[in-house]
C-alpha cells in the first residue's frame, strides 16, 4: 500500500482526551455485588448454569453460550449467587434484562485456569474453542462473538487482517492507554489470529493524535511483518467499513461483510483479551473503560470487573453530583443516556461520560428541515440523511430500504451539523426497529403459511391413501363375489326342487299361522298385565290405602290368569311337527332370532341381579322372577327349534370331514361351558350347556364309528416329577437376572449395588450347575 485512501464525509472534532490520559490505567476497587447480564453481546443470550445460593470462584463459567452466535459468561469474582432475574440494563430502551447477581466474598479466589503459552503448537480449531470458552466478544462497541467472527466460511479466504486502534470518538481513550501500557498483549493477540487465519497482510490503523501508542506498538513489534499505519484524525475513521476503506481503498458491499472481500477487522481491546484467554487461560471478566466528563474530579481509564455497578465506578472517579447533567454510556456522538446509575458495566462499555451542562446541554427544540445539505456532505457512507428523515416521518419503509437505511452506521455526524437540531439518528433507529419488527412478522406469517400448506398436503396424502385402500378392498370384494358366483354356478344341483320346497314352507306357515298369532296375542296380554301390576305396586309404596291394595290384588289375579293362559297355549303346541320345521326354520332366520332373544333375556336377568344386589326388595324379587320365567321360555323355544334344525351336510362330505366337524363342535361346547362356569351364570343355563356338551360327545363318537378310523393306541409314559430344589434354584436365578438388568438400566446406578447383583447372579448359576451334576 503506497498511500492512504479516503472515505467520504467525516468531521474534525475536538478530542477532549487530555484529562483521561494523564493517569495510567487504574484498578477499580472490589464491589459488594456484581450484576452480570446474560445478553451482553449480539446474538442469543447465554443460558445460566448456576443456581441461586451456589458458591462460585473467580473465572468460573456461570452461563453457557446458547448457539453459535452467543458468548459464555464467567464470575467476575468469588462469592455466592444471590439472584437470577430481571435487573436494570444499560440500553437505550431502559428496559430491564435477565442477569446473574453475585455477592462478593472479598477473597478473589480463582478457579483452575488452563494457560497455553505455546499457542503455535495448537490447531486453529483448538484456539477457536479456547476463545469461545473465554466468552470474548467485540470490545470496540458492537459485541459480536469473536469466535463466530473468526470461524469464517471455507470459501472466504482472509488475506488481510485489519487491527482497529483508531478510537476516533471524543473523550474515549481506553484503547490509547491499552496500546501504550500493554502493547505486548495486543501484539500477542495479533499473533494468535495470524495463527488461526494465516492472512497475507496485517495492517494496524492508529490515528495520528496517539503518538505514544504508535511508538509503544512500534517498539514491541520486533521482527513481525505487521504494518502500523498512522491515520488522519477524522471522525468516524474508527468505523469498520471506514477503516478498511482508509487502509485498503476497498469498499465493503452494502449487504455484505468484510469477510466477503477477504478482510477481517478486530479491535485492539479484543486482541488483548484473546491473548489473555489463550496464553494465560483467563476468561473475559474485566475491561478497560474511560471515565470522563466535567462532573468527575479525577477522569481516568480504569480496569473494572464486568458487572460492577456504574455508580460505584463514577464514585471512584470523584463524581460531583451537583455538576452532573447526565451520564452517557459511550461517547458524545454514538452513546446513549443511562436512565439508572445502578446498571452494571458490560463487555461493550468503553466509556462512561459524566457530562456537565457545558458538555451535554439540554437539546434545543427541533426545527423543520431547511434542506441545506450539510448532513449529506458529512455522511461517511454517502447517504441522503434528509431524504431518509422525510421517509421515516411518513413510515415509507420501502423508500427507506431503497435509499439504503441499513447502511447507516449511526455515527451521529448528520445530527451534529444539522442547523435545525433534528435528532436524525433517533429517527433512523426507530425506523430500523419498525422494519425489523415487520420482517419478523412477515417471517412468522410465512412460516405459518408453510406449516399450513404442509398440513394440508399431509391430509390430502392421507385421504388419497385411504381412498386407494378402499378401492383396493372393494376390488378384492368384487373378485371374491365373482369367484363365489362361479363356484355356485359350477356346483351340482341338489335333489330337492327349490320351488317345491318354497311351496311346502308356505303351506306349513299357513297351517301354523293361527296358533302362532294366538300365542303372540297371549304373550302381549301377559306382558301388559305384568306391567300394570308392577305400576300399581309402585303406587302402593307411596299410597298405602285399602283401595290401592284391592287394585293390586285384582291386577295380580289378572296377571296370573294371563300367564296361565300363555302357559296352556305353549303346552298345547305339538312337540314334533314333521312339516313344521321347514316353515319355522325358514333360512334359519327363526333359529337365529330365538338365539338372540334367549341371549338378550339372559343378559337382562344378569344386569338386574347385579343392580338389585344381594338383598332385593319385594318389587325387585318380582321383577327377577318375571325375568327368570322369560329366560326359561326363551330357552324352551330355542331348544325346540334346535331339535328340528337340520344338520348341515356339505356336498360330497366324507367320514373324515364329519369327524373333524364333530371335534370342532365338541371343543366349542367345552369352551362355552367353561366360560359360563367362570361367569357364574344360572343353573338352568349350565344344565343346558352340559346337555349340549353331552350331545356333542355322542356326535363325536358316532362320527368316529362312521369314519372307520381305528382308535389310537394309548401308551402310558411315566413323567419324571420336578425336583423341588431345581425349581427353587431356577427361581433364584431368574430373580438375580431381573435385579441385575434393572440396575444396568439405571443411569446413576451405584457401583457397589451392581457388583453385588453380579455376584448374586454368579452364585445362582453356580448353585444350579452344581445341583445338576449331582
Curated annotation (Swiss-Prot):
GO (cellular component) term, any one:
plasma membrane
- A single GO molecular function term of this UniProt record: electron transfer activity
Q: Which residues make up the binding site for [4Fe-4S] cluster 2?
A: 379, 408, 411, 414
Q: Where does [4Fe-4S] cluster 1 bind?
A: 369, 372, 375, 418
Pfam families on file: Complex1_51K (PF01512), Fer4_7 (PF12838), RnfC_N (PF13375), SLBB (PF10531)
Q: Which cofactor does it need?
A: [4Fe-4S] cluster
Q: Where is the composition biased (Basic and acidic residues)?
A: 453-490
Protein keywords? 4Fe-4S, Cell inner membrane, Cell membrane, Electron transport, Iron, Iron-sulfur, Membrane, Metal-binding, Repeat, Translocase, Transport
Q: Where is this region: Disordered?
A: 453-493
**Which PROSITE patterns does the record cross-reference, listed alphabetically?**
4FE4S_FER_1, 4FE4S_FER_2
**Compartment list:** Cell inner membrane
The free-text note explaining how the cofactor binds reads: Binds 2 [4Fe-4S] clusters per subunit.
The reply on keyword Iron is: yes
Q: InterPro entries under this entry?
A: 4Fe4S_Fe-S-bd, 4Fe4S_Fe_S_CS, Ion_transpt_RnfC/RsxC, Nuo51_FMN-bd, Nuo51_FMN-bd_sf, RnfC_N, Soluble_ligand-bd
- Give EC number(s), comma-separated: 7.-.-.-
Could you state one GO biological process linked to this protein?
A: electron transport chain
Decide whether keyword Membrane is in the record.
yes
Per UniProt, subunit arrangement is: The complex is composed of six subunits: RnfA, RnfB, RnfC, RnfD, RnfE and RnfG.
Function summary? Part of a membrane-bound complex that couples electron transfer with translocation of ions across the membrane.
Family that this chain belongs to:
Belongs to the 4Fe4S bacterial-type ferredoxin family. RnfC subfamily.
Q: What protein name does the entry list?
A: Ion-translocating oxidoreductase complex subunit C
Q: Which gene encodes it?
A: rnfC
Amino acid at each position: 500500500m503506497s498511500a492512504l485512501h479516503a472515505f467520504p464525509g467525516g468531521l474534525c472534532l475536538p478530542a477532549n482526551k487530555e484529562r483521561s490520559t494523564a493517569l495510567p490505567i487504574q484498578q477499580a476497587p472490589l464491589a459488594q455485588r456484581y450484576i452480570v447480564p446474560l445478553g451482553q453481546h449480539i446474538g442469543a443470550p447465554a443460558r445460566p448454569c448456576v443456581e441461586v445460593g451456589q458458591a462460585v470462584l473467580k473465572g468460573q463459567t456461570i452461563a453457557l453460550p446458547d448457539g453459535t452466535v452467543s458468548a459464555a459468561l464467567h464470575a467476575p469474582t468469588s462469592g455466592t449467587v444471590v439472584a437470577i432475574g430481571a435487573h436494570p440494563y444499560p440500553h437505550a430502551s431502559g428496559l430491564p434484562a435477565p442477569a446473574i447477581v453475585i455477592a462478593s466474598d472479598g477473597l478473589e479466589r480463582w478457579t483452575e485456569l488452563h494457560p497455553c503459552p505455546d499457542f503455535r503448537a495448537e490447531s486453529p480449531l483448538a484456539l477457536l474453542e479456547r476463545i469461545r470458552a473465554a466468552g470474548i466478544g467485540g470490545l470496540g462497541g458492537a459485541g459480536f462473538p469473536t469466535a463466530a467472527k473468526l470461524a469464517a466460511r471455507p470459501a472466504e479466504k482472509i488475506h488481510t487482517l485489519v487491527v482497529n486502534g483508531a478510537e476516533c470518538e471524543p473523550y474515549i481513550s481506553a484503547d490509547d492507554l491499552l496500546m501504550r501500557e500493554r502493547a505486548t498483549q495486543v501484539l500477542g493477540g495479533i499473533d494468535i489470529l495470524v495463527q488461526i487465519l494465516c492472512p497475507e497482510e496485517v495492517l494496524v490503523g492508529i490515528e495520528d493524535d496517539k503518538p505514544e501508542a504508535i511508538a509503544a506498538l512500534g517498539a514491541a513489534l520486533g521482527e513481525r511483518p505487521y504494518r502500523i499505519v498512522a491515520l488522519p484524525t477524522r471522525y468516524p475513521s474508527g468505523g469498520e467499513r471506514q477503516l478498511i476503506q482508509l487502509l485498503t481503498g476497498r469498499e465493503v458491499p452494502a449487504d455484505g461483510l468484510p469477510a466477503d472481500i477477504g478482510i477481517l477487522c478486530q479491535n485492539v481491546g479484543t486482541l488483548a483479551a484473546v491473548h489473555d484467554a489463550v496464553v494465560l487461560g483467563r476468561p473475559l471478566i474485566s475491561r478497560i473503560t474511560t471515565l470522563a466528563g466535567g462532573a468527575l474530579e479525577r477522569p481516568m481509564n480504569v480496569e473494572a470487573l464486568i458487572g460492577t455497578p456504574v455508580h460505584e465506578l463514577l464514585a471512584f472517579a470523584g463524581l460531583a453530583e451537583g455538576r452532573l447533567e447526565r451520564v452517557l454510556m459511550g461517547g458524545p456522538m454514538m452513546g446513549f443516556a443511562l436512565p439508572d446509575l445502578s446498571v452494571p458495566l458490560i463487555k461493550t462499555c468503553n466509556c462512561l461520560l459524566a457530562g456537565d451542562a457545558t458538555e451535554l446541554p439540554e437539546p434545543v427544540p427541533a426545527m423543520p428541515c431547511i434542506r441545506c445539505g450539510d448532513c449529506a456532505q458529512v455522511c461517511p457512507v454517502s447517504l441522503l440523511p434528509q431524504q431518509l428523515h422525510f421517509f421515516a416521518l411518513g413510515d415509507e419503509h420501502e423508500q427507506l430500504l431503497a435509499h439504503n437505511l441499513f447502511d447507516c452506521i449511526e455515527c451521529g455526524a448528520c445530527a451534529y451539523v444539522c442547523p435545525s437540531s433534528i435528532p436524525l439518528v433517533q429517527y433512523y433507529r426507530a425506523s430500523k426497529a419498525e422494519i425489523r419488527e415487520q420482517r419478523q412478522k412477515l417471517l412468522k406469517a410465512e412460516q405459518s403459511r408453510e406449516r399450513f400448506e404442509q398440513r394440508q398436503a399431509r391430509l390430502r396424502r392421507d385421504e388419497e391413501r385411504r381412498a386407494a385402500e378402499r378401492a383396493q378392498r372393494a376390488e378384492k370384494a368384487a373378485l371374491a363375489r365373482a369367484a363365489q358366483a362361479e363356484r355356485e354356478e359350477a356346483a351340482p344341483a341338489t335333489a330337492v326342487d327349490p320351488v317345491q320346497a318354497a311351496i311346502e314352507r308356505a303351506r306349513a306357515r299357513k297351517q301354523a299361522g293361527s296358533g302362532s298369532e294366538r300365542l303372540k296375542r297371549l304373550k302381549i296380554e301377559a306382558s301388559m298385565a305384568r306391567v300394570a301390576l308392577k305400576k300399581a305396586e309402585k303406587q302402593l309404596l307411596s299410597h298405602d290405602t285399602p283401595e290401592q291394595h284391592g287394585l293390586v290384588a285384582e291386577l295380580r289375579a289378572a296377571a296370573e290368569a294371563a300367564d296361565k293362559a300363555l302357559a296352556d297355549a305353549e303346552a298345547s303346541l305339538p312337540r314334533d311337527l314333521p312339516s313344521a320345521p321347514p316353515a319355522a326354520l325358514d333360512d334359519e332366520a327363526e333359529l337365529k332370532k330365538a338365539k338372540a332373544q334367549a341371549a338378550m333375556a339372559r343378559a337382562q336377568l344378569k344386569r338386574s341381579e347385579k343392580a338389585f344386589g344381594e338383598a332385593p326388595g319385594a318389587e325387585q324379587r318380582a321383577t327377577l322372577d318375571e325375568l327368570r320365567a322369560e329366560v326359561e321360555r326363551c330357552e324352551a323355544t330355542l331348544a325346540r327349534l334346535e331339535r328340528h334344525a337340520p344338520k348341515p351336510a356339505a356336498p360330497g362330505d366324507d367320514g373324515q370331514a364329519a369327524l373333524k366337524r364333530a371335534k370342532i363342535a365338541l371343543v366349542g361346547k367345552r369352551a362355552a361351558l367353561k366360560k359360563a362356569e367362570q361367569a357364574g351364570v344360572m343353573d338352568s343355563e349350565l344344565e343346558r350347556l352340559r346337555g349340549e356338551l353331552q350331545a356333542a360327545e355322542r356326535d363325536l363318537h358316532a362320527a368316529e364309528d362312521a369314519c372307520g378310523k381305528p382308535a389310537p393306541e394309548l401308551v402310558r409314559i411315566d413323567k419324571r416329577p420336578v425336583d423341588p430344589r431345581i425349581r427353587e434354584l431356577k427361581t433364584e436365578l431368574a430373580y438375580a437376572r431381573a435385579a441385575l438388568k434393572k440396575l444396568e438400566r439405571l443411569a446413576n446406578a451405584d457401583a457397589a449395588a451392581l457388583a453385588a447383583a453380579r455376584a448374586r447372579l454368579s452364585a445362582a448359576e453356580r448353585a444350579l450347575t452344581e445341583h445338576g451334576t449331582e
